[in-house]
UniProtKB/Swiss-Prot annotation:
Span(s) of short sequence motif NPxxY motif: 396-400
Cystines in this chain: C109-C187
Family statement: Belongs to the G-protein coupled receptor 1 family. 5-hydroxytryptamine receptor subfamily. HTR1A sub-subfamily.
Motif (DRY motif): 133-135
Protein name from the UniProt record: 5-hydroxytryptamine receptor 1A
Cytoplasmic membrane side: 60-73, 133-152, 217-346, 404-423
An annotated GO BP: regulation of behavior
Chain residue ranges for the region called Disordered: 1-20, 235-277
Regulation: G-protein coupled receptor activity is regulated by lipids: phosphatidylinositol 4-phosphate increases HTR1A-mediated activity.
A Pfam family hit: 7tm_1
Keywords: Behavior, Cell membrane, Cell projection, Disulfide bond, G-protein coupled receptor, Glycoprotein, Membrane, Receptor, Transducer, Transmembrane, Transmembrane helix
InterPro entries: 5HT1A_rcpt (IPR000610), 5HT_rcpt (IPR002231), GPCR_Rhodpsn (IPR000276), GPCR_Rhodpsn_7TM (IPR017452)
Amino acid sequence: MEGLSPGQGNNTTSSEGPFGTRGNATGISDVTFSYQVITSLLLGTLIFCAVLGNACVVAAIALERSLQNVANYLIGSLAVTDLMVSVLVLPMAALYQVLNKWTLGQVTCDLFIALDVLCCTSSILHLCAIALDRYWAITDPIDYVNKRTPRRAAALISLTWLIGFLISIPPMLGWRTPEDRSDPDACTISKDHGYTIYSTFGAFYIPLLLMLVLYGRIFRAARFRIRKTVKKAERKGADARSGVSPAPQPRKSVNGEPGGREWRQGPGSKAGGPLCTNGAVRRGDDGAALEVIEVHRVGSSKEHLPLPSEAGAIPCAPASFEKKNERNAEAKRKMALARERKTVKTLGIIMGTFILCWLPFFIVALVLPFCESSCHMPTLLGAIINWLGYSNSLLNPVIYAYFNKDFQNAFKKIVRCKFCRRR
């Protein structure tokens, strides 16, 4: 968003322009040819990469059927929004930055500011919509499967654009100060104090708080599931070490009841270790081995499977079995830890990139209108902060799509033109 105009990072009569050029009384700087060339190359590269990256995401979702689901519809809509930023907003912003003054007239300036605020706000709110969708998916997976419909995605997308529209239109309807249009060489957003609070909180601070809460809860829910899986595996390992194994299914029933069986105390514990028998063995409370004896009807008599004697019993070999269980439990613990680290890393990248790109801009956008006479913002720093926010439109497709293996496969198909051959 165009909160700081080039050359107007401060309001002093002798301000430093970009790359050390000297400003005049209005803060507009004459720039050198080398500055214009370097700035044009840097900003041109940024715009080209942003257009290419977001266009590839849109093409991948449109061409690859496996990517056509509600979660990816939101990512696709984010890519369309960032593509609009890259095509409709960034070229005019780059021209303004390179020339260091506005040359396209007041009407175009109003349109530029409105598009800037609309598209950038919608892009930020799309990140909230994606966070909300992920939160519902992980905290209510069973019910949300039926609720996660294209219609719901369309409602979320429409809401992002509606809020963006409500934030971008007021300055065009007069919510601005007279000084906002006093300089024909400058094009800046309204510095009205009421609008400043309304726009910065609506476009950034409230969405930021919402994303922090949602991703915090997503992390807690994911960590709970991961640790629950580990505990379940550890319980299974403990059961195996304590000597519990499932009894074999009986072939016949006793007295008409399938699976007739009875428990008898056996001599396993007295022999100094578990004994292998023809029944399932478990430990009693007193440490004695209890052996399940399958009872079968043979003719008219009931026969019990013979209990093995202490001397003739075949000793089991639980050591290797227990070691295997311990290895499996340890492997699951390591996998769970790796998954937890990956969750932290992913959420850290998402929130870290968003905050890094937009927080400096919105701090300046909120503070500067309230201290115009006393605040000093170097012009170069103002330009860097401004374009750091714009660069979020370049980084979004990298974070939300290029790290996804399904998207990577679709991109490879696009590069190899496999979609063209299929048609």
